[in-house]
Amino acid sequence: MSVRFPRIASLAGAPALRERIAALGVTLPCDDDALAAPASPLASPATIAAPPGALPRVAANRFAVQPMEGWDAQEDGTPSALTLRRWQGFGRSGAGLVWGGEAVAVQRAGRANPRQLVIDETTAPALGRLRRALLAEAPGPPPIVGLQLTHSGRWSRPDAAGLRPRIAFHHPVLDRRTGAVGESAVLTDAEARVLAGDFARAARLAAAEGFDFVDVKHCHGYLLHEFLAARSRAGEFGGAGLDARTRLLREIVAAVRDAAPGLLVGIRLSLFDRVPFRPAPAGASKGRLGPGEPEPCALPYDAGFGVDRDRPTETDWSEPLALVRALPALGVTLINVTAGSPYYVPHVQRPAAFPPSDGYAPPEDPLAGVARLLDAARRAKAAAPELAVVASGLSYLQEFAAHVAQACVRAGWFDFAGLGRMALSYPELPADVLAGRPLARERICRTFSDCTSAPRAGLVSGCYPLDPFYRERPEREALARAKSAAREAR
């Protein structure tokens, strides 16, 4: 049977949250009250350094909006009215930093969804209009706005035909899940170099449209993240040594800087990973998902980055922190710390009270997952203090997101408190916190995971439970039917 953990909304104030943190034996600072500007550490400006040829940027405050895909672009890869609405919400947030808006594919074949945004010469002007629409909604100083660039790798689904995986190496567990069979699925070294050129072209286009930075995405099981774990790969971009497995990262960053020298470069990085998890069959009951359990795997487990080879549900920090320390010399000035993947370890990547339809019940109190993510951001900041560090996982803290975030920023754990799922249900939360306004509790994200379950069912993403706009759309009924069918199939 799945274990029920105390829900954040049931905790009577910050002291109760601290008691729960202590009971779990994790470390997570939490203030008694969320402070308004100017007293709040979250209200202080932050300067983001720049490499030679670029100018530093100053963020007005320490809130950041995380990239949140809607899977609602037009078929040609340009924004739709739904995309525009979401980005306007990011603008209304009042956050000092908008990390990419959402993932934008640098190759059409590298989309994770047929309705993912694409950047090329035909779509870039529309992305520029999206950025300007976001800025027009800002309630205060304009935020720093980046664009997240990606190739979805083994999770590529560019059309309705289904997955068309391109992989860095054959994975002992994930190949079965994604149908990545044969050597034709493996990206060749020549194709990897073409990809580096596509990232550079995308960066040049983003700079021309006024974006402050690009994110060379290395997280969540997508292609560039997978290269970091490519120990079994032959050729220039894989092997036992970290230097070989980060060669593609270095070449892409160098190409981006050469193509757009005035642009800042960031990396959203899964700083650690885990062996893939699955629902435990023995724990399922009455249509409920069983708790997550690790897939059986041979040891040593060499298919993860930041994973202990002999205990693949634990972290080995040596390579991740070595990479973080190397980033400033490459010209990277921002890092957004995350972990794992939503496809195979969602409890690690986005702690939630309610699992997505294709996931599993939490195998741990999600609060422990938040503590692990914020500790990872703390480690990254300690390893490279000159980097601007964004933390992830704070949406799960709900009413207490600012209580914890301001305590962490004050203590120097990280520079920016990232909010992702919260930016869908309640984008204005940062502005309300900094203005000292009471929070709109009916809009606070409760981690229902419908923003993930909907695209798994082929629907656009959005906060169906809490956002009246999505609650009234016909997709809500389709989502309810899909979730019911999934329960009946268990």
Locate the predicted segments by residue.
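Flavin-dependent oxidoreductase catalytic cores
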Residues: M1-R490
